[in-house]
Amino acid sequence: MKKTKVLLTTLLAGAVVLSGCSSKTETSSSSNKTEQKEEKKNSNEPKLGTPIIFDKQAEITVKSATWTDERNGFESKPAKKVLLVTYDIKNLSDKDIPIGMELSLYVNGKKAESYPIQVTLNSLSPNRALENATHAFAVNEEGSLELEVQPFMSTSGKKIIKLDVK
């Protein structure tokens, strides 16, 4: 159990350190052009059940995000709610990739901590797929939920799925 926590913590720290993000904001003098760009941007937003392809790296499909009553009796950090995310991943690269570091949850813009239940930590060979991988998050406040999706050590940008979990 301690080795799993150390591995998970190390991978999370590595993902945070190595993930870079850039945001581009385009402005237009015409409000019509701005509205059209926003419509196109919204239509390309990733959604649950829709495959997200990261060029020559991975294809990730977030299948579901549900609240669970399951708790880890050994976890010292309290969790008001636990969100369990289930996803499929396919390795599109020519090298093994680590599984379990693709997702980050933000609640009201604040990063939620991973919660140690049903966490899939694995590796995936080239051109292979893993179905029903899971990742859990501790959610301690109400608000908007955004799931960031990005393969571990990816150079391509992350994708954000806005969640509406009841």
Segments (PLM) and residue ranges:
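Bacterial N-terminal signal peptides that target proteins for export
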Residues: 1-8
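Conserved functional micro-motifs across diverse proteins
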Residues: 10-12, 16-166
